[in-house]
Amino acid sequence: MKSKFTFLKLFLGCISLLIISNKFISNAKGEELLKVELHNEIKKGKFLIGLKQYLGGENDSFSEKKNINFTTNKGFLNLISSNGIKHKSKQINITWADIPVKNPKTIERIVFGPFASYESAKKQSEKLRDKGFETTVAYPKNWEVWIPFQDDLPEFELKNKIFRKIKNFQITPVLRNDYSGMKLEGPIYIYSEEKIKINGVNFGKNFYLIRDLYGTWTLVQKIEFDDYLAGVLPYEIGPNSPLEALKAQAVIARTWGIFNSDRFNMDKYHLCISTQCQVYKPSKISNKNVQKAIEATSNLILTYGNQPINAFYHGSNGGVSATAGEAWQIQDYSYFNSIIDGSKSLNKIFKLPITNESYLNNFLDFDKEQFYGSNHSLFRWNKKISSLEIKEKLIKNKLININDDVLDLNSTERGSSGRVTKLEIQTNKVNKSIVLVKDDIRRVLNFIPSNLFTINKLSDDLWLLRGGGFGHGVGLSQAGAIEMAELGFSYEQILNHYYRDAKLENIELLSQ
């Protein structure tokens, strides 16, 4: 049963409001002042997507020349800068200049992290807020939590996490033509009635350049929900997936995007385009099945308690799904349960929780054809790892130094699905063991496809990991959804299978 309700009701108190600028000319005619509010764009059915991050800085890899070139085949491009500059032409070229600061200032903060995921960073942020700290969840390269620097730090350990940097210059965008350049101020709005190419790639019609927390810039695209999904589905589940699986993916990608639309509010946009959000690339060729799936589910999302759910999904669960609390250092959501993902007969053979390695080995050895999604290339996997490989990863993550050696590897805690939630790595340093928890296991040992594995010691410096699945294992398994669709399940049945007690709701967007 699908019901309707307005976005205003749905999001009352759910997503924080953030005004980008109250001096920003951004309607199609470029004549009216308009407040661009992240929350209001969502209510209108639009995402602000961070296409390219860290522009103008050391990590700017958008082009070799460190510039952005906007072109259009028809009509004109319009640029409006917050310092009053307006420009109209067939081509706009923006470069970056390091402008010296008259009064250099020292930036100081206390940094916690890195964290493997936004979810774990947000949980740390909440813990610090409960202690009275003002926090910011940021993503300079990895997820971090920042609190303001204080001379009188309440905990000694904080003194090891101080970040200091003197700001001598400011990265400034410059509008270039054949003869000169004009300094611009953000936000900068670039739009056209026709599609715009950026560095030779077709994107859309509405873009912003916005300064981020790190002194660099982000290229942001404003895009309708369904146009965004057309660039997500082909790269998340594949354009040739069965139609019902594509429909299920469309619903959860839309739901996930809405629920997580405050993920980058510190940098004044909603979502990124990498696996830290949902993989998005501009749609070059329209795929009929992808479009059918999006149109058939337009404005449909999954809700629980009249709010959108955090619709996690992944590649393969290896035959058993995880709870959110197994994957990240967060509280569980009631709509996620560990389930044996396959035929009903499997639930008679295997009972949850899977508490020990012997039971998990039996599970991994069982006939995989009875599970949904067993065709995935990593549904079952074996990985030999040496002490040297582990050591290299620990050094890279600054957990040990070059003189330390790895002696042993043990799982000390498992979740209800059998996934490792605590991994102890013993070293030759007296009383020195490294304990990796939940998503940090795969962040540090990133050669492990999932946390569903057993450990078998082959020699003093070699272990065999036997495992299943690819990804965190929470929510919909894309491989499972594809097989369920091939077996004749509808997208509603697929969603109900992976998100118990969640409701399919039809949202009503505010008028444009």
Give names to the regions the model predicted:
Residues K2-Q512:
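Conserved, single-site charged/polar hotspot
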